[in-house]
């Protein structure tokens, strides 16, 4: 039997770079919120212990795909602790709607959905803490998707505090470019010393993203989309880009602006949600 699992997008409602560690990783403070929009992952169980991704991504080797890596990591971790039923395997496919290099967390969300779904389907019984710890080895954003609640993140993104920001409507726009995270983090002009503040203080301040100035400078497409959106509503970059978003109080307001969008702007309207659609589906 084939089952389907949500793999939602996320937004960084704010993102501040507070420093850089000796190993090169940047420390940050950011606010994650999910969207009721994303990819859909389909899983059909196998009994021969094999993992197959039926919808390969162009330019990404099968074993390098985060979906396959997540499945194999769960398989190994569960097997090593005697919690993997004999023959556990899966055929996995994905209906991909989230762009790569968009700052919406698509790859991290895919990995988290596979960890959570296969742990359930295989009946491994790993805890949420164990899954989140495994997820961190796949990517800094994976744990927040595993835990499934909007969160204030610190460190390199792995220290999570659940929060409940307002669930607004967003017009999310893709400028048509892909921005690899290292391009932003290696830029010498990236702010790296924003003072650390408490979550209480940050929630009272106007939200912004330290990466935005670099993305706008290096990618004129990002600058053009943000300039257009800012005429209608508070707007900013998510993650390291390339996607940007404008926030609205109602769905109709967001859709009215999208209807006025120039032809070169690709976007969608979605609601911010504090409980991940993946975890809502499991209730």
Curated annotation (Swiss-Prot):
- What is the recorded name of this protein? 4-diphosphocytidyl-2-C-methyl-D-erythritol kinase
Q: List residues binding ATP.
A: 99-109
For this protein, the record's NCBIfam families field holds: ispE (TIGR00154)
Record text on subunit structure and interactions: Homodimer.
An annotated GO BP: isopentenyl diphosphate biosynthetic process, methylerythritol 4-phosphate pathway
Q: Which Gene3D superfamilies match?
A: 3.30.230.10, GHMP kinase, C-terminal domain (3.30.70.890)
Its UniProt pathway annotation is: Isoprenoid biosynthesis; isopentenyl diphosphate biosynthesis via DXP pathway; isopentenyl diphosphate from 1-deoxy-D-xylulose 5-phosphate: step 3/6
Q: What is its EC number?
A: 2.7.1.148
Q: Which GO terms describe its molecular function?
A: 4-(cytidine 5'-diphospho)-2-C-methyl-D-erythritol kinase activity; ATP binding
Question: What is annotated as the active site?
Answer: 10, 141
Top enzyme class: transferase
Family, per the entry? Answer: Belongs to the GHMP kinase family. IspE subfamily.
Highest lineage ranks of the organism? Answer: Bacteria, Pseudomonadati, Pseudomonadota, Gammaproteobacteria, Enterobacterales
Among InterPro entries, the record links this protein to: GHMP_kinase_C_dom (IPR013750), GHMP_kinase_C_sf (IPR036554), GHMP_kinase_N_dom (IPR006204), IspE (IPR004424), Ribosomal_Su5_D2-typ_SF (IPR020568), Ribsml_uS5_D2-typ_fold_subgr (IPR014721)
Which key words are in the record? ATP-binding, Isoprene biosynthesis, Kinase, Nucleotide-binding, Transferase
Q: Which organism is it from?
A: Escherichia coli O9:H4 (strain HS)
Catalytic activity reported: 4-CDP-2-C-methyl-D-erythritol + ATP = 4-CDP-2-C-methyl-D-erythritol 2-phosphate + ADP + H(+)
